[in-house]
Every structure is written in structure tokens, then in C-alpha cells.
Amino acid sequence: MQTAYWVMVMMMVWITAPLSEGGKLNGEIRGLVSHILIPQHTLRSLTSRDRSDNGGSSGAQICIWKVCPPSPWR
């Protein structure tokens, strides 16, 4: 329970830190947060786990915030 609370607090700081003056605080906080907790790493680990479970790439696109990259054959 304490870990979940700490992760929630750190994610709130991660979201609000870019609002700080000049982004200096944001850079310092990023240095304190483990690279495992950053959203990009979490997304990457979820997609790699999904691909390994399916036995390879199924050709499905991952859309973030409902914005999908265009397919090369469109």
C-alpha cells in the first residue's frame, strides 16, 4: 500500500513538474525517479510482453490518446 501511494505521488509530481520555471525542477525530479517508473518504459514493457505472448507481431497498431500513426500502405 505504501508503494502504491509513493508511485501515485511521484506520478503527480511527474505531471506537474513541467509547469515549474524553466523546466529545471522537472530535470531534477527525473533524475530522482527510477527509469522503470516512467510512462515510456511502462508502455514499452507492456507492448513487448504482449508481442511475446502472441508469438510475434500481429500487425496491430498501438494508438496513444486515440492518435494512430498512418500505415505505410495507405
Swiss-Prot record:
Alphabetized GO MF terms: toxin activity
Keyword Repeat: no
Secretion signal, residue range per the UniProt entry: 1-22
Main location: secreted
Keyword vocabulary terms for this entry: D-amino acid, Disulfide bond, G-protein coupled receptor impairing toxin, Hydroxylation, Secreted, Signal, Toxin
Subcellular location: Secreted
Keyword ATP-binding carried by entry: no
Modification 4-hydroxyproline occurs at: P69, P70, P72
The organism's place on the tree of life at top rank: Eukaryota
Propeptide boundaries: 23-57
Domain statement: The cysteine framework is C-C.
Protein family membership: Belongs to the conotoxin C superfamily. Consomatin family.
Described purpose of this protein according to its UniProt entry: Moderately activates human somatostatin receptors (SSTR) with a preferential activation of SSTR1 and SSTR4. In vivo, does not cause behavioral changes in mice within a few minutes of intracranial injection, but causes a progressive loss of movement thereafter. Four to five hours after injection, mice recover, even with the highest dose tested. Shows antinociception and antihyperalgesia activities in two mouse models of acute pain, most probably by acting outside the central nervous system.
Miscellaneous comment: This peptide is an evolutionarily optimized stable analog of somatostatin. In addition, it adopts nearly identical conformations as in the somatostatin drug analog Octreotide. As this drug, it contains a D-Trp at the same position, whose synthesis is a common strategy used for enhancing the metabolic stability of compounds in drug design. Consomatins evolved by gene duplication of a 'Somatostatin and related peptides (SSRP)' gene expressed in the snail neuroendocrine system.
Protein name: Consomatin Ma1
Annotated source species: Conus magus
